[in-house]
Amino acid sequence: MTRTALLTIPRISPIVSIAPTANKPMIVSTKGRYALRVMVDLAQRDREEYVPLKEIAEKEGISQKYLEAIMTTLSKAGFVDAVHGKGGGYRLNRTADSYTIGSILMLTEGSLSAVACTAKGAAACSRSTCCEALPMWERLDRMINEFFNGITLADLLKDRETEQ
């Protein structure tokens, strides 16, 4: 069992949960990473054709059951069209340049905040009026959101083509 310690900075409430390894990155969940991979995969394909779940799962190395839950989330949010049955599958319903990475990650993550106290819908922190670090965390959140909202699926495809 992994134990998690809280980093406490003097005069500031516990703000960051750190696992025993000091080089732990800020985390985007597996669901978020897989959703992004699937959206990139679909963006590389013909928008008129439906791609079977099994084909996507095999190409991306994701279990069909887990992928089905992700695709349901994407479909309900209007990110993809879904057709069930023979000849069915999934496809993007807009051009790749109309999907931002931020919108995909916000859908799957709920928040891209670096700390819990700045997350959308978080309960007001009792220290927010006297927390010297709060403006810094809020700036970081804005930077993260601006970064991810400034990149589209089309940008990722172009960047990949440029590298090759």
Residue spans for each PLM region:
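Short, intrinsically disordered or compositionally biased N-terminal tails of bacterial proteins
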Residues: M1-P25
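Residue cluster at the C-terminal edge of the helix-turn-helix DNA-binding motif
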Residues: K76-F79, L107
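Beta-hairpin "wing" of winged helix-turn-helix
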Residues: G78-G87, R91-N93
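Residues in the helix-turn-helix
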Residues: Y66
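Non-DNA-binding regulatory cores of transcription-related proteins
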Residues: N93-Q164
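N-terminal helix-turn-helix DNA-binding core of bacterial DNA-binding proteins
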Residues: V28-T30, Y34-S63
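Alpha-helical residues within the helix-turn-helix
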Residues: E58, S75-K76
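Short, hydrophobic-biased segments on the C-terminal half of alpha helices
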Residues: M71-T72
